[in-house]
């Protein structure tokens, strides 16, 4: 199981939110570049990077900063937040970003996902499914659709998506443990596509449980920044 430390960017700083609430923001490192270097120096190979400003603006707000992170750190990076156009994806891939996460647009315009898969390939496109009580949330988690997370995942898999990031918004940033039942259901319902878990990880035991379920990777944020899980422990899972 791959471990992906998370860096969420808001106003140029690394932050953590509580249940996706922008009003409950904690700055964990004011220097994004320094945080990326910390991961790199610890032997981490791949990170999960979210442009929180972009989720609200609907554009690549922190594109220049993200480009600098890639250039200086040399880390493998997947980027999400505000991805609305193929041109944005082209731009990110051109500067070396490894994977692009499509979130809201998977619900609002499935043809956009199809076009992205056709142009860039399934190894470069990840669909991020964020859900509240099992229903898909969009627009930086500010809106909730009537689409069930399993239904969306199965539709996207038929389209050719091979990797999903599933976030239980109600667990994100809470340190209450991941929603294991949701991950069990999602892994069992998908035919060949893989799942990366996100939201709620609090301790090392949570990573062991997720590995047993069969997720391909897990994103770790607050548990690391709070000191619950060390970088050495993350590395032991193949981070």
Curated annotation (Swiss-Prot):
Q: Which GO terms describe its biological process?
A: L-histidine biosynthetic process; L-tryptophan biosynthetic process
Q: Which residues form a coiled coil?
A: none
Matching entries from InterPro entries are given as:
Aldolase_TIM (IPR013785), His_biosynth (IPR006062), HisA_bact_arch (IPR006063), Isoase_HisA-like (IPR044524), Isoase_HisA-like_bact (IPR023016), RibuloseP-bd_barrel (IPR011060)
Identify the pathway: Amino-acid biosynthesis; L-histidine biosynthesis; L-histidine from 5-phospho-alpha-D-ribose 1-diphosphate: step 4/9
Statement: the UniProt record of this protein carries the keyword Amino-acid biosynthesis:
yes
Keywords annotated in UniProt: Amino-acid biosynthesis, Cytoplasm, Histidine biosynthesis, Isomerase
Query: What is the annotated localization of this protein?
Result: Cytoplasm
A GO molecular function assigned to this protein is: 1-(5-phosphoribosyl)-5-[(5-phosphoribosylamino)methylideneamino]imidazole-4-carboxamide isomerase activity
Q: What is its EC number?
A: 5.3.1.16
**Source taxon at top rank:** Bacteria
One GO cellular component assignment for this chain's record is: cytoplasm
Q: Which residues form the active site?
A: 8, 130
Q: Which reactions does this protein catalyse? A: 1-(5-phospho-beta-D-ribosyl)-5-[(5-phospho-beta-D-ribosylamino)methylideneamino]imidazole-4-carboxamide = 5-[(5-phospho-1-deoxy-D-ribulos-1-ylimino)methylamino]-1-(5-phospho-beta-D-ribosyl)imidazole-4-carboxamide
Q: Which HAMAP family match?
A: HisA (MF_01014)
Which family would the database say this protein is a member of?
Belongs to the HisA/HisF family.
Protein name according to UniProt: 1-(5-phosphoribosyl)-5-[(5-phosphoribosylamino)methylideneamino] imidazole-4-carboxamide isomerase
Species, as recorded: Streptococcus thermophilus (strain ATCC BAA-491 / LMD-9)
């Amino acid at each position: 199981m791959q471990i992906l430390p998370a860096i969420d960017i808001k106003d140029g700083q690394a932050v953590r939110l509580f249940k996706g609430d922008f009003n409950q923001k904690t700055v964990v490192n004011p220097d994004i570049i320094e945080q990326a270097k910390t991961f790199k120096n610890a032997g981490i190979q791949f990170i999960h990077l979210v442009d929180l400003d972009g989720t609200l603006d609907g554009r690549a707000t922190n594109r220049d900063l993200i480009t600098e992170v890639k250039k200086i750190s040399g880390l493998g990076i997947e980027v999400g937040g505000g991805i609305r156009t193929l041109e944005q994806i082209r731009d990110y891939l051109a500067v070396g970003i490894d994977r692009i996460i499509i979130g809201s647009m998977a619900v609002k315009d499935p043809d956009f996902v199809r076009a992205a898969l056709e142009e860039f390939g399934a190894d470069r496109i990840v669909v991020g499914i964020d859900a509240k009580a099992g229903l898909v949330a969009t627009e930086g988690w500010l809106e909730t659709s009537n689409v069930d997370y399993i239904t969306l995942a199965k539709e996207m898999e038929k389209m050719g998506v091979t990797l999903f990031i599933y976030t239980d918004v109600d667990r994100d940033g809470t340190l209450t443990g991941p929603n294991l039942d949701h991950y069990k259901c999602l892994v069992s319902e998908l035919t060949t596509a893989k799942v990366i878990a996100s939201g709620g990880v609090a301790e090392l035991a949570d990573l062991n449980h997720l590995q047993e379920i069969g997720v391909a990777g897990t994103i770790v944020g607050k548990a690391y920044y709070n000191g619950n899980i060390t970088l050495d422990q993350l590395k032991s899972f193949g981070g």
